[in-house]
Amino acid sequence: QAGGGRIRAIWFASDDWKFDFNVSYDYTDEGGYPYYEVNFHEFSQKKEYDPIAYNRESSYRRSLLNTGLNIEHQADNFIFNAVTGFQHLNDRMFMDQDFTPLDYFTLEQNQRINSISEEITFKSKPGKNWQWTTGLFGFYQNMDVNAPVTFGKDIMNYFNRIMSSNIPINIEVPMGQGMAMHIMPSVNITTPEMNNDGRFKTPQHNVALFHQSQIHNLFEVEGLSFTLGLRLDYEKFKMKYNTGTPIDFNVSVKGEMSKNGEVIREIEMMPTTPLNIEARYKGNLSKDYIQLLPKFALQYDFNQGKDNVYISISKGYRSGGYNYQMFSNLIQYKLRNEMQEQSKKAIIEKAPKEYTEIVNEHFPTSGNIASLKDAVEYKPEYTWSYELGTHQSLFGGKLQTDLAIFYMSTKNQQISKMAISGLGRITENAGESESYGLEASLVANLN
């Protein structure tokens, strides 16, 4: 189901003032994410497509409102523009994110985004050798995301197997004369379905001041122009997060006395003990950036402005941010570590004293978890671009040619990839990259 509409109204208040208002609304409610597995056979070079098979709902619903107002004033020596924009987005997504009939995990994501922007510019009127534009830009966005993840019974069984592989299931203590004591700890998750709630608020502020000047007929050379642009950009990101989940599990320790490999006595060293932990992250992150972005260009027009050659240099910037999808990974690691620590502590407290040191020696210590900031934050991307090109009009305008060569150097390049947990896509910095290119086009008029 989908629907929407758009209204636009233009009012010429006078010869010098123009008001352009528009509003649009879009609504969609649909099923979604028909993913399936593709099996490729190397020898036959054939592909087999598995059927689409889900056990949970997959759908998407979105409500989107956009409004804008453009005010233009033609003064004697300049043109004034003020562009105001507002956007409201409210959506809900259900995704069976294992894409199989098994009950692994499903994601529900509810987003509410409100953003407002304002750009005010003053620019010169055409016809003079000095053409300029000066402006101020402001932007604010508040995004509120509620994204609980449900882990079903099949993935809980998998977690149990992982926990079993992380603890010693049989600690053998030789006792001489063919006798041995076998200490067998056991950890079993009893929570049938785990609900990992996730609430994230990410306000973003951006302010920029910019100016661009273009000088025509530079040094009194007709057709030669130079462009200089500067943009001072300030951005601030915040994220308020509250996400986590409790889990119930049992810990027990059994013992077996053996002689020459045969069990002669079973001992309950620690009765089944229920435990509960909660892995949760709650707090705030904040980061701000300030950048000066220059642009330089030199162009020479000839043949009555029909042909030109040019060179340009500019710096680009893509802001950083936060991947809230990474919290699922952190919570899984934290659950594993805390389960190991609590299990070890309970065994040491309740098992017979003569065996606690042995258990303490063989039980694994908790692994290291990446810092929250390092795990969820990605850095801004910076790019320097260089381009040399020409436009030629040949054979009386019957053949138009464009040729350009370019080079781009990017630092902290941002790429999109699936999170390790499989719960959504994340943005990650991939390091540095260089791009070289050649672009050519021909347009012929055969009339």
Task: Give the label of every model feature segment.
Residues I7-W11, L69-H73, E118-S124, L209-I215, ...:
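Residues on the lipid-exposed face of transmembrane beta-strands in outer-membrane beta-barrel proteins
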Residues F21-Y25, T84-F86, T134-Y140, L228-Y234, ...:
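Transmembrane beta-barrel strands of outer-membrane/channel proteins
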Residues G138-Q304, Q340-K344, V359-S371:
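Signature of Gram-negative outer-membrane beta-barrel scaffolds
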